[in-house]
Amino acid sequence: NARIETLEEKPAFKNYITNRCLVIATQFYEWQWIDEKGKSKQKYSVRSEDSEIFCFAGLYSVWQDPESNYSILTYTILTTEANELMAEIHNNKKRMPVVLNNEHHGLWLQGENFKDFAYPYQSDLLATPLP
């Protein structure tokens, strides 16, 4: 994961800000700390209310193994401050993935300023505790 707020500062990510991708998902998982040190945790499944697919803002790069010359396509999911629901679940760092509204998919891929997407997704996420 990469914090969207610090992309320009981090050497691992600043050269890839223009390498944008959508990471498509139907759900994701987060852990809630039950105790102060995180030794006891509760796993949650997070999805949209309508169970539709959604997209995270991502960056990609190609890593080339210097020995074999084999190329591997890699990606990272961007994170931002948590919305109310995710702050309750991801209660240690209070972060969440950058979930893009449907109308923002094209804008993200076309290179709009990444800082314009540094906001917590506010609608229709449901979290279900898992055994």
Predicted regions span which residues?
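Short linear sequence motif anchored by a di-proline
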Residues: 1-131
